[in-house]
């Protein structure tokens, strides 16, 4: 039923917080900027407009929009000197978390590139930012390590006896944003900052691993750059860890009270629980 002749559509919601519940309502404007920017990232082509009243009747307006969603966001993060060009992949899968659970559909979208200057991984589900990741993060870790390790082994990039790469070696040069939508969602807890869907994790792992393997075959130059940078990250991390352990060992030896101090010997007593120490000035 038509009740008016306005051309614009939509819903306007105005609300005031209950001060008995929300005792502190001084929310910084940066919080709203962050929320709107994230929503613009995962809702491609939708403009989010923030109007902030800085004085009576005076407003500052900001707009947030990414025409191509997470793909444009990746390009913004990577800049002009990334190791590889950003890529965007998407797929749909159907499945269930357990045999006794209902089947549901999930839509997967991933945009990524590699860089030796910027590193960031963000995960979204049903337009919500997953601060603690959960299933998408686990899938990314598994798929990335599996696909890149396979490329390194197949192309003899490891030196003899060298340990396998780990996800931190990849993460140090990875810019990745994933956005998924599903008709069934299991959250880790009430804060809803991580999802635990087993099927989403399995579907995304298989999807991302297969796309990466194809990408490495079709983009040899990019694959070589990725492999080289991941190995640099790995070997740098291992060198730093060895240095840290050696330094810790040296410092521990200097302060180890169990070591005998020069010109001091254990006192002699039949009671093994007693010791005597003389502290002499100088």
Region roles according to the model:
Residues 1-281:
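GHKL-family ATPase ATP-binding module
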């Amino acid at each position: 039923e038509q009740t008016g002749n306005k051309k614009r559509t939509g819903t306007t919601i105005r609300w005031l917080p209950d001060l008995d519940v929300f005792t502190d309502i001084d929310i910084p404007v940066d919080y709203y900027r962050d929320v709107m920017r994230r929503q613009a990232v995962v809702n491609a082509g939708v403009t989010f407009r923030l109007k902030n009243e800085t004085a009576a009747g005076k407003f500052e307006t900001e707009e947030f929009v990414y025409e191509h969603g997470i793909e444009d966001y990746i390009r913004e993060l990577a800049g002009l000197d990334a190791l590889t060009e950003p890529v965007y992949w998407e797929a749909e899968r159907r499945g269930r978390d357990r045999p006794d659970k209902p089947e549901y559909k999930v839509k997967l979208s991933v945009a990524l590139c590699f860089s030796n200057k910027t590193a960031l991984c963000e995960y979204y589900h049903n337009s919500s930012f997953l601060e603690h990741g959960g299933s998408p993060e686990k899938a990314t870790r598994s798929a990335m390590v599996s696909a890149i390790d396979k490329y390194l082994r197949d192309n003899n990039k490891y030196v003899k006896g060298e340990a396998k790469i780990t996800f931190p070696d990849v993460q140090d040069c990875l810019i990745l944003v994933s956005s998924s939508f599903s008709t069934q969602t299991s959250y880790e807890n009430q804060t809803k900052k991580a999802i635990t869907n087993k099927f989403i994790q399995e579907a995304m792992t298989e999807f991302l691993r297969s796309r990466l393997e194809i990408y490495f075959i079709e983009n040899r130059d990019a694959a070589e750059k990725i492999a080289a940078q991941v190995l640099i990250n790995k070997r740098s991390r291992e060198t730093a860890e060895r240095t840290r352990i050696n330094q810790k060992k040296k410092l521990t030896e200097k302060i180890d009270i169990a070591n005998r101090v020069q010109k001091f010997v254990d006192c002699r007593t039949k009671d093994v629980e007693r010791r005597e120490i003389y502290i002499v000035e100088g």
